[in-house]
Each structure stands twice: as C-alpha cells, then as structure tokens.
C-alpha cells in the first residue's frame, strides 16, 4: 500500500520529531506496517469522525493509533489514482485529539 501524509497536519509534526526518539521509531514502524498492507490501530466509527477530517480531507473512514507520550496518529485508507493508499491525516497530542473529537 502507498503511504502519504497530509502536509499541514502530519508532515510538519513528523518532521519535527527527534529521529532517535521512541515516538519517531513507533510512527516509522506504523508507516512500514501500512506499506505492507497491515491495518494498524482501531477503526473510528463514521459518526465519530470529526467534521474537520470529512470536510478538509473528504474521508469516509479513519483509524487512530495510540502512541507513546500521549500522542495519536490518525489515518484513512483511500483509493488514490487506482492505488490503495494510507493517508496519514494527523499526528497530534492527547489534548488536541480530545478537542478535535469533541471529548
């Protein structure tokens, strides 16, 4: 599966991680699993997907992965140019995740 990240909500946060940190290694491990067609994390019910994701990214499915240091990775499985693609939507802290999901 192809893996791409959102420039605003994922790529900037991922690029800012310390390459030697456990968090970086965990996110890289998730990316590697996704490339091998392994679904990681828990599926988010459609009604619980934030409007922000639906409107900005046009997603109709989403998964979340709990990471060290209270971080969360949100992604969607899409079909882009005829290829199955894991679209990494957002890498966020727990507080921002709760706010985004209305908790």
Model-identified regions with their sequence ranges:
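Enriched for short, Lys/Arg-rich terminal
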Residues: 1, 15-17, 60-103
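Arg/Lys-rich, positively charged N-terminal/basic patches that mediate binding to nucleic acids
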Residues: 1-36
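Compositionally biased, intrinsically disordered low-complexity segments
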Residues: 30-33, 47, 77
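Alpha-helix initiation/capping motif
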Residues: 6-7, 50, 93
């Amino acid at each position: 599966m192809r893996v791409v990240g959102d420039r605003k909500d994922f790529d900037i946060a991922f690029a800012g991680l310390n390459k030697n940190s456990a968090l970086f290694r965990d996110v890289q491990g998730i990316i590697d699993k996704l490339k091998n067609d392994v679904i990681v994390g828990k599926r988010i019910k459609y009604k619980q997907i934030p409007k922000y994701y639906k409107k900005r990214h046009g997603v109709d499915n989403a998964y979340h992965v709990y990471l060290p240091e209270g971080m969360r990775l949100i992604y969607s499985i899409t079909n882009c140019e005829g290829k199955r693609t894991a679209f990494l939507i957002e890498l966020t802290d727990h507080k921002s995740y709760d706010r985004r999901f209305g908790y």
